[in-house]
């Protein structure tokens, strides 16, 4: 019973806690103005033409509400959006790592009787936490998380597709594959 409670925490609550902690950390270190790497997105939002681009239509639609902000607030708003995308990406990474099959050898399969080969030891929280720390504290990830370069949105979509595939492995519902195909494009 205690193992189920612990694994339920690792698979359901821990990703949200990691995402919230990442949002606080990235929010505290948020770039308040446009950086050189975020300049194309900031100028695209600040421009008053509403012609949708041929490439990246989802990014255009998601950045559209930022046009309502005053011009001085647009860079900070876009940077906050990038921080939210980064936090959600780390939450999806934690959930995906928790869903990965852990036991591979025959001896491990005999010892571990869980239905989907999920890690159920007392330290099952360590792999998702370690994965998100390694990814979230990497300099390039941090730079894109605190400035609106657009990379975090792409990475969020990729992380969601991976999560959908791992969720499909667990419960075999085709809705996960449909979501994956929809997000992948």
What kind of region is each of these model predictions?
Residues 1-25, 88-91, 115-129:
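Start-transfer (signal-anchor) and selected internal transmembrane alpha helices
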Residues 24-42, 146:
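Helix-to-loop transition at the C-terminal end of transmembrane segments
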Residues 46, 50-76, 80-84, 91:
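Short hydrophobic/aromatic helix or loop-helix immediately within or flanking a transmembrane segment
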Residues 61, 65, 96-99, 144, ...:
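A residue-level signal for alpha-helical anchor/packing sites in multi-pass solute transporters
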Residues 72-79, 111-121, 128-154:
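Aromatic- and kink-enriched transmembrane "portal" helix at the membrane-lumen/periplasm boundary
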Residues 80-117, 157-167:
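Transmembrane-helix motifs of polytopic, lipid-linked glycan transferases
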Residues 122, 158-179:
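Membrane-interface transmembrane helices that cradle and orient dolichyl/undecaprenyl
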Residues 132, 177-185:
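Membrane-interface alpha helices of multi-pass inner-membrane proteins
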């Amino acid at each position: 019973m205690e193992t189920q409670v612990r694994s339920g925490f690792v698979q359901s609550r821990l990703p949200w806690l990691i995402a919230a902690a990442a949002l606080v950390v990235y929010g505290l270190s948020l770039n308040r103005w446009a950086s050189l790497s975020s300049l194309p997105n900031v100028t695209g939002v600040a421009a008053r033409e509403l012609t949708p681009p041929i490439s990246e239509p989802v990014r255009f639609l998601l950045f559209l509400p930022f046009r309502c902000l005053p011009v001085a607030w647009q860079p900070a708003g876009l940077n906050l959006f990038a921080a939210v995308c980064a936090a959600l990406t780390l939450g999806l990474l934690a959930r995906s790592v928790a869903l990965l099959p852990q036991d591979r050898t025959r001896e491990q399969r005999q010892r571990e009787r869980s239905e989907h080969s999920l890690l159920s030891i007392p330290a099952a929280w360590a792999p998702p936490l370690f994965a998100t720390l390694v990814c979230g504290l990497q300099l390039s990830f941090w730079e894109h998380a605190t400035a609106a370069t657009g990379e975090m949105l792409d990475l969020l979509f990729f992380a969601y597709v991976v999560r959908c595939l791992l969720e499909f492995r667990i419960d075999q519902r085709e809705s996960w594959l449909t979501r994956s195909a929809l997000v992948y494009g």
